[in-house]
Amino acid sequence: MESNYQRTLVSAFLNISVDQTVETAIKCLKSTNWKLEDAINLLFAIDRMRNNQTLTLKPSDSTRLPSLSPPPPLNLLFNGSFEDAKLASSSKDLWLLVHIQSETEFPCNTFNRDLWSNEDVSQALEFRFMLWQVYDHTSEGRKITSFYMIQHFLIDPITGQNICIWRGEIKAKGFLKDLKKYIDASPHEHIASTARNMRVKAEKICHSDQQDMVGFTDDDFDDFDEGNLSSDSVVVSSCGREFDDVVTLSEDEEETCLSSDLFEFPVLTKEPKGDCDRSVVCSISVRFPNGRRKQRKFLKSEPVQLLWSFCYSHMDESDNKAFKLVQAIPGASKTLDYGAEASFDQYGIANSIISVTWE
């Protein structure tokens, strides 16, 4: 300790927190820049984490509980379940950074000390990210690792999609480089940008097709020997060079190619199973153009874009073309907007019937 003031803070910490050691007090105070209130809150946060994890351990495993060295970054850390972390980060428009710690792997225990405490990393994360930590031997830790199967990853809280992963030891400089594009745009801004890019790409493809047709002259068509052309291939002469075996696509094939180029829907989250709380889960019935019907449960808090992902995943390859979703309303209909920044509940389509129609 460097000063009488710091000794006073340690004494105050020990008076408030019963049965704690001087070493624990110093570690908590140092990690919070010698702010007494933050240090006490940090200790309570660690105790809550320990209590939650103790429920999943055998008595013989109690010695495996994490030590206070090094402590997690209180200003970045979210205290709660994974679902709560997704909801909180989505409402605050922050990326959710998930760190699954292991007591058996040394690098996992150095993140708080070497990575999260790095000044540049801390500043970057505080601006755009929320950090959620869990140990892999806990019930929630096992559930998350079985679903995502990795230890350090970045989650889009709106879609639940895993969009970036890290393995092993992570250096601050490389970590910041990986996060740059997520620092530049929040989750909602990222979705809006993706929707705009899809529209721009469609416009460019249409414009390119028009330019290709403008480039042909009457002389080009006069050069064709119609008697030698089959119904599905042509030889195009341009600038003195000939390109053989140029196959023209049918209308359905063109739409299929266009669709595969344009559609980049978010990855579907896992469907809620069993008896679900109707206050948090909704059921959507989808009617496809060929008469098929599919039903699927979603969390009411999940983004409506997942409905497009679900419909697209159930289309046959021959049906893989541009489509729109229409909500069946008595006496009217409502075409859904893919760019809507809303959940199923907010958009008013929870427990409704949706029809898929071709554009």
UniProtKB/Swiss-Prot annotation:
UniProt keywords, alphabetically: Ubl conjugation pathway
Record flagged with keyword ATP-binding: no
Every UBX domain range: 277-357
PROSITE patterns linked to this entry: UBX
Annotated Pfam families: Thioredoxin_7, UBA_4, UBX
InterPro entries: Thioredoxin-like_sf, UAS, Ubiquitin-like_domsf, UBX_dom, UBX_domain-protein
GO biological processes: proteasome-mediated ubiquitin-dependent protein catabolic process
Membrane-crossing segments per the record: none
A GO MF label: ubiquitin binding
Cellular component aspect of the GO annotation: nucleus
Keyword Nucleotide-binding found: no
PANTHER family per the UniProt record, alphabetical: FAS-ASSOCIATED PROTEIN (PTHR23322), PLANT UBX DOMAIN-CONTAINING PROTEIN 16-RELATED (PTHR23322:SF78)
Protein name: Putative plant UBX domain-containing protein 15
Organism lineage string: Eukaryota, Viridiplantae, Streptophyta, Embryophyta, Tracheophyta
